[in-house]
Amino acid sequence: MAKDYPYGEGKVKWVNTDWLADHLDDENLMRLDVQPNVHDYIKEHIPGAVYMNEGLLRIPLRGLPAQYVSADVMELLFRRVGLRPEIPVVVYTGVGPFSGWGNGLEQTMMAYTLVRFGHDNVHVLDGGIDKWKAEERPLTQTFPEVEESDFNAVDRSEYRVEYDEFRALKDRGDVIVLDARPGNVYEGQGPWIKAGHIPGAVNVPWKSFMDPDNPRLLKSDEEIQAIIEEHEITPDKTVICSCGTGREATNEFILFKWYLDYP
């Protein structure tokens, strides 16, 4: 069955390349390029897109790497790139034409972060800029004119779980913990001091849900549902998404929360 785009439930929705092409001249639609390196953006980007690197979102905190910056800092970043809560923003990434890298998680990291810190209308470009380019759609090297905004950021606690809360929840019968890391890392071959996984966590690598040739493109709904049924993930359970640094988990968090409409 054909989808009506934007597709999804709530604060994050998915759009396809046809939809974005039809809305490319819409002044009330922001495009946010999150390719891995600024030189990827400089070399080529979707017309009208502003660049923002996911590396700005997290820094060390008291020795712990990859901790989100405060809401005050995030607010400054959001204002500088011109984000406005009333205007939808399409987020996309791809294999950078300069860096030659990009695994697709750039756009799920950014989508999750935007919502966590106060945006309510985020669109993810299914297939990313790679699909856009494969279809020979327009690209540019021109930078758009951007006015700073007055975005007010807040760190929404409902989109994260703290360590002590997690320990209290993880063994409950109505809770399922997903481990989004690759299988070999789940099995103990990762770089961590304590290799392995959280006892009871179910390993569903984030790439399981994505097209094998383009990890920015979701598999069909039928394939996604088959994976969910295989692992007995049901909407009557609280799903906690986990990984190593919180990056891989964003792919499954936005998928279950807003694509599949899990509570």
Model-derived regions, located:
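Short cysteine clusters
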Residues: 243
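Positively charged, proline/Ser/Thr-rich regional signature most characteristic
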Residues: 4-86, 94-98, 169-235
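Thiolate-centered catalytic microenvironments shared by cysteine-dependent enzyme domains
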Residues: 2-7, 68-168, 189, 247-263
